[in-house]
């Protein structure tokens, strides 16, 4: 186990007398960062000519330049650079990055993020409580401060609509809160329709958190649901996609986490939602920024620091944007006394920024872990001693020996309920297409821009459930693509133009015990193996990033119209309008299954 963890810094309650002595000059600090400008997230000002005194991994004081006259402290000269608090990401899913918590920490620290709040519902959907607790153990050994928002919607809907590996009941969630101190909130309550309609299971889960004084995170689409959602105790959401619903949510007392992501992905809603501030005049005091989902490649390129700079581009002052990226997330979860600012007693989680507000150095608990944009030997050693997941996590893809992945060709005129994909890939259209009698599927593909899609149950909980569907506008012209990260139940989703290539893709994932792949002419052209729960790699984030880059190249060659992370969302049966799970095609507004074909 690494000695560079959240627990390396003692609790403030055990350090107050010592820190008071250091701040008063009666004791020497361990480290003094001199020659700095300081970004205060409390007053939202940049203060010139300051030095930061650090002892025992905590800030003793921020003082005027030249205050330190001792001789025992290590001196770091910031040379006029800007010191700011480490960033705090209030909503992420580590599993989306396809790396473990320890590996995730490497990318986060390179980007100046020192604290994250993780909803581990992905691994919970595969391995139930055992998966959540394995990730908590992983997080405890990581060189980062990782808190849990307990998964609230596992499965995302109901056993009638999909088969998940996990089933986190109110009783299991209550037990997680009672056992794990770092379980600080209830994770995003995605089944917002059920919450609004008063579903008994959903409200029992809400009660498990509220009875213990834990805040509830949300996930809601549609202004018509906001009032009931807020009345049910939900007090934050990251799903505000435009200024109108953002304004509704603020007025309902719900914190906003503005989600930023690469514009080619489904996660870049910040530019529209931030207009509640820049156009409608709302205060930014209950608004933070978050990343939500990143793959390993994008995690290195588009961290929370990038999202914070996007807020600046959208009209926020740098001091405001950095507060939204640090103090506000900490405040939402009641941890502003420990992180999010440079006040006395806070953890010494700091970043040195260049003039473009890009992190150059990162200190975690007073230890220099990133210097000149490269990890230090101290961090490299910590990252080399990663947590080993339980053996059961490496055996979660359980498929029948034979499964048919394509539907029978209709012999009569029918109406097909197809799934229309559109950029960026979050919402999917329900498109009814009339298919005339034909002897070949290729005729329908050419005429209507279709391809096959199937979802195969992989948890070993059914007799080999497989559902068939048709994608329109996906633009896959040949071959197949497949993923074991089919949100949120994480069954295997396969799309293709022919049964043979789809079978190759399915079996490649089975052999690797998880992954994302592209197949052309019977050969796997790209593969990201994900052997831990079918979701995570056991490699360093930089290695996984290279595998993801290669996958993206082949994905683009295949012609797919949405990125693979959008493809992974196709089974997510809580986002309109139509989805496919292992049980069939789900009409989301009605929460019911419809057959692929009906008589014309």
UniProtKB/Swiss-Prot annotation:
UniProt key word Amino-acid biosynthesis: no
Pfam families listed in its UniProt record: Adenine_deam_C, Amidohydro_1
Molecular functions per Gene Ontology: adenine deaminase activity
Gene3D superfamilies: Metal-dependent hydrolases, Urease, subunit C, domain 1
Keywords (A to Z) from UniProt: Hydrolase, Manganese
Cofactor(s) listed: Mn(2+)
GO biological process: adenine catabolic process
InterPro entries per the UniProt record, alphabetical: Adenine_deam, Adenine_deam_C, Amidohydro-rel, Metal-dep_hydrolase_composite, Metal_Hydrolase
Entry's EC annotation: 3.5.4.2
Signal peptide positions on this chain: none
Keyword NAD: no
PANTHER family: ADENINE DEAMINASE, N-ACETYLGLUCOSAMINE-6-PHOSPHATE DEACETYLASE
Family: Belongs to the metallo-dependent hydrolases superfamily. Adenine deaminase family.
Protein name: Adenine deaminase
Species assigned in the record: Chelativorans sp. (strain BNC1)
């Amino acid at each position: 186990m690494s000695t560079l963890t959240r627990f390396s810094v003692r609790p403030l309650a055990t350090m107050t007398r010592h820190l008071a002595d250091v701040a008063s000059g009666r004791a020497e600090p361990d480290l003094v960062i001199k020659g700095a400008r300081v970004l205060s997230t409390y007053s939202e000002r940049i203060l010139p000519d300051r030095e930061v005194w650090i002892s025992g991994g905590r800030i003793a004081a921020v003082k005027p330049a030249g205050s330190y006259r001792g001789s025992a402290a290590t001196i770091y000269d910031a040379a006029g650079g800007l010191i700011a608090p480490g960033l705090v990401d209030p909503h992420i899913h580590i599993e989306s990055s396809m790396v473990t918590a320890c590996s995730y920490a490497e990318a986060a620290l390179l980007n100046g993020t020192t604290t994250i709040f993780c909803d581990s519902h992905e691994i919970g959907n595969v391995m139930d409580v055992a998966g959540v607790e394995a990730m908590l153990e992983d997080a405890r050994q990581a060189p980062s401060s990782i808190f849990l928002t307990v998964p609230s919607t596992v499965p995302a809907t109901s056993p009638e609509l999909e088969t998940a590996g996990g089933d986190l009941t109110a009783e299991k969630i209550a037990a997680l809160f009672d056992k794990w101190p770092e379980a600080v909130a209830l994770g995003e309550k995605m089944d917002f329709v059920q919450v609004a309609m008063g579903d008994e299971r959903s409200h029992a889960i809400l009660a498990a958190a509220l009875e213990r004084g834990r805040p509830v995170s949300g996930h809601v689409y549609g202004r018509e649901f906001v009032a009931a959602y807020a009345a049910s105790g939900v007090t934050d959401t990251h799903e505000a996609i435009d200024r109108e619903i953002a304004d509704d949510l603020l007025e309902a007392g719900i914190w906003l986490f503005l989600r930023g992501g690469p514009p080619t992905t489904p996660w870049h809603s910040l530019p529209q939602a931030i207009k509640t501030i820049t156009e409608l005049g709302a205060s930014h005091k209950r608004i933070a920024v978050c990343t939500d989902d990143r793959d390993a490649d994008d995690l290195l390129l588009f961290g929370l620091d990038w999202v914070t700079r996007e807020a600046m581009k959208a009209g926020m002052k740098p001091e405001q944007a950095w507060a939204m990226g640090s103090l506000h997330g900490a405040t939402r979860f009641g941890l502003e006394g420990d992180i999010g600012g440079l006040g006395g007693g806070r953890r010494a989680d700091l970043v040195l920024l260049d003039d473009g507000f890009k992190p150059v150095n990162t200190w975690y608990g007073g230890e220099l872990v990133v210097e000149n944009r490269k990890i230090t030997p101290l961090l490299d050693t910590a990252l080399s001693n990663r947590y080993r997941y339980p053996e059961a996590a490496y055996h979660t893809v359980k498929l029948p020996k034979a499964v048919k992945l394509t539907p029978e060709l209709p012999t009569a005129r029918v109406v097909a309920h197809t799934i229309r994909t559109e950029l960026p890939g979050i919402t999917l259209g329900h498109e009814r297409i009339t298919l005339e009698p034909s002897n070949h599927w290729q005729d329908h593909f050419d005429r209507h821009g279709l391809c096959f899609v199937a979802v195969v149950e992989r948890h070993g909980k059914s007799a080999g459930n497989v559902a068939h569907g048709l994608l329109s506008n996906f633009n896959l012209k040949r071959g197949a693509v497949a993923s074991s990260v089919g949100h949120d139940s994480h069954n295997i989703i396969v799309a293709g133009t022919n049964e043979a290539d789809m079978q190759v893709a399915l079996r490649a994932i089975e052999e690797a015990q998880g992954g994302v792949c592209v197949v052309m002419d019977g050969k796997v052209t790209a593969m990201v193996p994900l052997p831990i729960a079918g979701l995570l790699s056991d490699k360093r984030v930089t290695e996984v990033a290279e595998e993801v880059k290669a996958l993206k190249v082949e994905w683009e060659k295949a012609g797919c119209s949405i990125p693979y992370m959008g493809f992974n969302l196709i089974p997510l049966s809580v986002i309109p309008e139509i989805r496919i799970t292992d049980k069939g095609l789900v009409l989301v507004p009605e929460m019911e299954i419809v057959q692929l074909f009906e008589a014309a």
